[in-house]
């Protein structure tokens, strides 16, 4: 019972990893081939060599004539056919077991990370990597599996090899036996003294089984072809619908906005903030931030920003007691951003930097006033 339960679990897992055509193919394989081969066909060919008679008494003549007529028994030929046809499926099952093993490891690691997460450890990146690996192997929630990636390629290759083996064995059977058996076979081979006639037992019954196995092989081949086209067109349909990797958007690089010319700063209107050239009468080291000049949607905002910057700078200097005429004159002419790059270059090159004189407005003390009015020996006479 243990072996049957293990086989049942294996078949259940294969059903989960197969398409509808694959499930039908497995049913045909196990019911109409293996089961029929082990019951009815074996009994029909049980007395094949013993019932093969020739009209001669020469020892060894019947054996050589049987070997010439049937190089390999039909039963053993069909056993080899089932083995070769099942090998691609076994390779696919090996890949399934590999995915199952990966699923167990990933689930165990995910549980450990979730336990660590409850203790306050930041494991979001590791959990994300586990989710990406599960998607890569086709593992989904609640044990569901979607055929994709390497598993899908293995499945397609197995279908191709099964189809090739089916066609090859059909051609070999047609070349060796044909698809029917005759009641009398003529043989002329040593040590037979002359040409002898040999007789086959139950030729009609065996012909019926041969035709039945031929039909089963053709049905299996048709199922493989239908399944191959189904998988191919389903993949094309998924691509047409635009189904992509859901983790691609989160793991891929983010593209910058079209309205932003520089990734340094981003304002509410989508304008960037490259450094503007120095204006006339601006102090050394002072820079204004403006938007992209080539972007017409940002020009009004850049003018307002520059005017506000100058107003703030004027207020700050006035609070410090600096003469406001210079600032007011420079502020009276706000920045303009013409579309012509040549005019902007002339404007930037036509003005030189003029440092502002810092005047100390603190009241002088009495000592200093006396010292300033007292003549000193090194003073010059005018």
UniProtKB/Swiss-Prot annotation:
Write out the PTM section of this UniProt entry.
Answer: Phosphorylation at Ser-325, Ser-328 and Ser-330 by CK1 modulates gap junction assembly. Phosphorylated at Ser-368 by PRKCG; phosphorylation induces disassembly of gap junction plaques and inhibition of gap junction activity. Phosphorylation at Ser-368 by PRKCD triggers its internalization into small vesicles leading to proteasome-mediated degradation. Sumoylated with SUMO1, SUMO2 and SUMO3, which may regulate the level of functional Cx43 gap junctions at the plasma membrane. May be desumoylated by SENP1 or SENP2.
Q: Name one GO biological process term.
A: regulation of apoptotic process
**Which GO molecular-function terms appear in the entry?**
gap junction hemi-channel activity; tubulin binding
Composition-biased stretches, type Low complexity, lie in: 362-374
Residue ranges of the region described as Interaction with UBQLN4: 264-382
Q: Per UniProt, which keywords does this protein have?
A: Acetylation, Cell junction, Cell membrane, Disulfide bond, Endoplasmic reticulum, Gap junction, Isopeptide bond, Membrane, Phosphoprotein, S-nitrosylation, Transmembrane, Transmembrane helix, Ubl conjugation
- Phosphoserine found at: 5, 255, 257, 262, 306, 314, 325, 328, 330, 344, 365, 368-369, 373
Interaction with NOV as annotated region, ranges: 244-382
Q: Which cysteines are joined by disulfide bonds?
A: 54-192, 187-198
Query: Where does this polypeptide localize?
Result: Cell membrane; Cell junction, Gap junction; Endoplasmic reticulum
Which stretches does the entry tag as region Disordered?
Answer: 317-382
Which parts of the sequence carry Phosphothreonine?
A: 275, 326
Predominant location of this chain? Answer: membrane
Record topology, Cytoplasmic segments: 2-23, 98-155, 229-382
Ranges of biased composition (kind: Polar residues) = 317-332
- Cross-link Glycyl lysine isopeptide (Lys-Gly) (interchain with G-Cter in SUMO) placement: 144, 237
Domain of life of the organism encoding this protein: Eukaryota
Give the way it sits in the membrane: Multi-pass membrane protein
The UniProt family comment states: Belongs to the connexin family. Alpha-type (group II) subfamily.
Subunit and interaction comment: A connexon is composed of a hexamer of connexins. Interacts with SGSM3. Interacts with RIC1/CIP150. Interacts with CNST and CSNK1D. Interacts (via C-terminus) with TJP1. Interacts (via C-terminus) with SRC (via SH3 domain). Interacts (not ubiquitinated) with UBQLN4 (via UBA domain). Interacts with NOV. Interacts with TMEM65. Interacts with ANK3/ANKG and PKP2.
Briefly, what is this protein's role? Answer: Gap junction protein that acts as a regulator of bladder capacity. A gap junction consists of a cluster of closely packed pairs of transmembrane channels, the connexons, through which materials of low MW diffuse from one cell to a neighboring cell. May play a critical role in the physiology of hearing by participating in the recycling of potassium to the cochlear endolymph. Negative regulator of bladder functional capacity: acts by enhancing intercellular electrical and chemical transmission, thus sensitizing bladder muscles to cholinergic neural stimuli and causing them to contract.
Q: What is this protein called?
A: Gap junction alpha-1 protein
Task: Please name the source species.
Answer: Oryctolagus cuniculus
Supply the gene name: GJA1
